[in-house]
């Protein structure tokens, strides 16, 4: 009979006190004897087999609390039964359950076969009739564990009892040996191409719309309030719309920014500030753009208190010397550096004329000294203050720029 079944039998009968340790063996009354280090057929949650020594010590000390039990195992140099295994093990040994998934049935059968010869040698004084009765008892326990007498053993159950999961569902889904980086790269390229096409389409539409709006404000489109046909067109318009053949952006309002790096706003970071309402330092944006400085960029107002307002596109440039005479008529705003040399070679006689025809903005940090804006205060320039750290306030500053700019453009078109 195997050690686990013998221990279960003695536990159910209440004969635990008859289990004695003699040297390196455990004696179960006068019937059985097993080495203390014998591995039983009961497997722990971690997968290892419990020794007979560990199970006997646990059964005899099952009433102890967890801390006291652990101290007892250390004191007696006995392997401990883990906390998750204790209740299922005790339920099996006390007969509350007939079997357990933790039992290695193949090992159980092997130990049963081996222990028969050992126990016969241990009890030489026992007659054959006693041995036969013990064999009958073993048969009864096997019937109890594996089914009714005469039924076949479920070998599938025995095989499954030895199965151990090698990989979990999560481990399979992780796909450690698979690399999907190429899929990500291709997807990113397609998305960037789609955004680029949409951006060009949107820009072309905004440019065309801005041209028509500018032409209407100048009164060169052939609309008339009377004297025309039913559709409102004048039969003899005073002027007609003529576009010169030129580069893209003709007719689009222009905003000038300083080319010097010591100012807060340049062609590097003006797009994020005006379109997204977020200020990014020049050096950070220049590093992101790898030092590539564009000659011209297009910005548009993406946010407004008036949601029904028409979106207008603007060109932003930082080289006034490259502007042609016709281009200066499209300049509507300038971000000033606060230095007179910024306006050198401009087609205006003084600052008064400049800021009568062009609205000026001076962007500064709110905690900068007053001396930094001393010269600017002598000009007709709008001072816009932003915080060095509170980026959530940038949107309000950008919105103030847009409102002042739109108000100036409307007043200029009506003058």
UniProtKB/Swiss-Prot annotation:
Chief place of localization: nucleus
Compartments annotated for it: namely: Nucleus
InterPro entries, A to Z: Cdc73/Parafibromin, CDC73_C, CDC73_C_sf, Cdc73_N
Pfam families recorded for this chain?
A: CDC73_C, CDC73_N
Q: Does the keyword rRNA-binding apply?
A: no
UniProt GO BP: flower development; positive regulation of flower development; transcription elongation by RNA polymerase II; vegetative to reproductive phase transition of meristem
All disulfide bonds of the chain are none
Q: Does the keyword Transcription regulation apply?
A: yes
Q: Which UniProt keywords apply?
A: Flowering, Nucleus, Transcription, Transcription regulation
Instruction: State the tissue distribution.
Output: Expressed in root tips, shoot apex, young leaves and flowers, especially in stamen filaments and carpels.
Q: Give the phenotype of cells or organisms lacking this gene.
A: Early flowering.
User: GO cellular component terms?
Assistant: Cdc73/Paf1 complex; nucleus
What does this chain do? Component of the PAF1 complex (PAF1C) which is involved in histone modifications such as methylation on histone H3 'Lys-4' (H3K4me3). Involved in regulation of flowering time. Required for the expression of the flowering repressors FLC and MADS-box genes of the MAF family. Required for histone H3 trimethylation on 'Lys-4' (H3K4me3) at the FLC locus. Prevents trimethylation on 'Lys-27' (H3K27me3) at the same locus.
Family listed: Belongs to the CDC73 family.
Assembly and partners are described as:
Component of the nuclear PAF1 complex (PAF1C), which consists of VIP2/ELF7/PAF1, VIP3/SKI8/WDR61, VIP4/LEO1, VIP5/RTF1, VIP6/ELF8/CTR9 and CDC73.
Protein's recorded name: Protein CDC73 homolog
